[in-house]
A protein has these predicted regions:
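Cell-envelope/extracellular polymer assembly enzymes that use nucleotide-activated donors
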Residues: 2-4, 28
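Short, well-formed alpha-helical segments that are part of the catalytic scaffolds
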Residues: 6-25
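Acidic helix N-cap motif at the loop->helix transition within catalytic regions
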Residues: 17, 38-47, 90-91
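A conserved acidic beta->alpha catalytic loop
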Residues: 22, 33-42
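Short beta-strand/loop segment that forms part of the nucleotide-sugar
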Residues: 26-36, 52-53, 83
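Conserved donor nucleotide-binding strand/loop of the catalytic core
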Residues: 41-74
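Catalytic-site signature of metal-activated, phosphate-bearing donor transferases
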Residues: 63-64, 70, 81, 88-248
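Short aromatic/hydrophobic "clamp" motif used to bind/position activated sugar donors
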Residues: 78
Length: 252
């Protein structure tokens, strides 16, 4: 059986070539582009990718294009890869072997090896993502960080890191930009109505303690500390926006 790799892109030229190099041995590479203005499509053409376009409109996240992308693939089995991820040869071989088994599931959670500032943030592992599926049985919701809905059974990859997607992760600058985007989307998705002063103080603090000490980022040196601090800031920014909306409603 054949497998299509599906990659959603928007101005993804920085790391796209190394991603495409890592998936060149799959049967098909489909790039679903949201009207990039850089040379993303030039790189995709160099690798012989099938290219489809999803209108950018005012979207700030990729999820609205996910369902369109997976169903544009030529093969039922699809592996969804982000433009800043790499697929190991061990993962590729495992997936091809897996779909030949008579008792396989209809989708698989795949683990991610998250890199930050050149270091593997081990505390974030396995960071499981539902990325391998029979697209004829999948529907992908448009909300941020959503997983596809599978009309069938779902399994998990072995936790051995050699089978993980390698995620390059964000630079510090991109991390800061993404915090604003993600908190705006979470604000719309969760519809939290109010926040207390206690939450403003202790929820970000607990997020830092959990990420840094409990999840093990303390073992990842300066990169782990910075990543934990970003995680706490993300929580604080979200709660601050909830409070901003709370105040706005009182005065409207």
């Amino acid at each position: 059986m054949k497998i299509s790799v599906v990659i959603n892109t928007y101005n993804a030229s920085k790391l796209l070539a190394q991603t495409l190099e890592s998936v060149k041995d799959f049967d098909e590479i489909l790039v679903c582009d949201m009207e990039s203005t850089d040379n993303t499509l030039d790189i995709a053409r160099e690798y012989g990718c099938k290219i489809v376009t999803f209108p950018k409109k005012d979207y700030t996240i990729v999820e609205p294009a996910r369902d369109f992308a997976i169903h544009a693939a030529s093969n039922p089995w699809v592996l969804v890869v982000d433009a800043d991820e790499k697929v190991t040869s061990e993962l590729r071989e495992y997936l091809y072997h897996y779909i030949e088994q008579p008792d396989h599931d209809d989708a698989l959670f795949i683990h991610r090896k998250n890199m930050f500032l050149g270091k593997w943030i081990k505390g974030s592992y396995p960071d499981s993502q539902l990325r391998f599926m029979d697209q004829t049985k999948a529907t992908w919701p448009t909300t941020i960080h959503s997983h596809p809905i599978i009309d069938g059974t779902v399994g998990h990859m072995p936790k051995d890191v050699k089978y993980a997607l390698v995620h390059a992760g964000f630079s510090v600058s991109n991390q800061i930009l993404k915090m604003d985007v993600y908190t705006e989307e979470d604000l719309a998705k969760r519809q939290q109505e109010s926040v207390s002063f206690t939450q403003l103080i202790f929820a970000p603090l607990w997020r830092f303690i959990k990420y840094y000490f409990i999840d093990g980022a303390i073992l990842d040196g300066k990169a782990g500390f910075i990543k934990a601090y970003f995680s706490a800031n993300m929580k604080f920014y979200y709660l601050a926006k909830v409070y901003e909306r709370q105040v706005s409603k009182k005065h409207s």
